[in-house]
A protein has these predicted regions:
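Residue-level detection of the helix-turn-helix DNA-binding "recognition helix"
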Residues: 18, 22, 36-37, 52, ...
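Helix-turn-helix DNA-binding elements, focusing on the entry/boundary residues of the two helices
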Residues: 17, 28, 44, 59-62
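Flexible coil/turn residues that form the inter-helical turn or adjacent wing/linker of helix-turn-helix
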Residues: 13, 24, 40, 55-58
């Protein structure tokens, strides 16, 4: 499967992942470790690339990230309209 990007961006939720991760005082390495408990193998460098919009993130990864950060999926899409030309 070829991964598409939107004007060089591979996801629109990375900035919010970073915001909520930092609000929960969780490091990228800690998030990576917590994800591995759910069977998701993302290194801390992958988390960094997701947060900088440089790595595609799968829907099931988002669900687990939300569970770890104790947020709803909708919260990851806050203020993401700026990435689209509506």
């Amino acid at each position: 499967m070829k991964t598409k990007n939107l004007n060089g961006i591979y996801n629109v939720v990375g900035l919010n992942i970073k915001k909520y991760r930092e609000a929960n005082n969780i490091s990228q390495r800690e998030l990576s470790n917590k994800l591995s408990l759910y069977g998701i193998d993302l290194y801390h460098s992958d988390i960094s690339r997701i947060e900088s919009l440089q790595l595609f993130v799968r829907d099931y990864e988002l669900k687990v990230i939300c569970k770890i950060l104790n947020i709803k999926l909708e919260q990851l899409y806050e203020n993401t309209d700026k990435f689209f030309n509506f």
